[in-house]
Amino acid sequence: MKSSRFLNESQTALVKQSWPMIVSNGFWTSFYTNLFKRSPSYQLQFDRFAHVPFEELESNVHFLAHSVRTGFVFNTAIELLETPDELHKILVDLGAKHRKFRLTAEHFEVVRDVLTRMIEDRLPTTGGPDRVALLAEAWKPFLTLVIGVIMDSATATVN
């Protein structure tokens, strides 16, 4: 895998520069609450907080821990953009760990959609609308790369 197929140097720089501003203020807990609002059945995929009432999720230690782990993987993916082989290995491994949940391409499409909307809503507005549009366009191939590799690995048939 060559990340250059997905992101050029400028896009990589924009993703890395904007990420700290996007991820602040409980991004990952908000991601999961937005995901579960959109698709309530997805919460059932998480054994440790499958039956926690929605209103109590943000105070549930297992929910918070999973949110932190997701953030760690995403941060690592951003850090490894210039080392595509390492990035690919980490994403494939993560996808393989998700095979047991029998997720479908649709699950991953919903995740990508929720992430895209959240990132677009949090893009820094300094620099005006042209800069915001440039940032949004830089994030699209990154999300396609990350979610796509995880999905391909998670949905692969293992012989």
Task: Name the predicted role of every residue range.
Residues M1-N159:
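Globin-like tetrapyrrole-binding proteins
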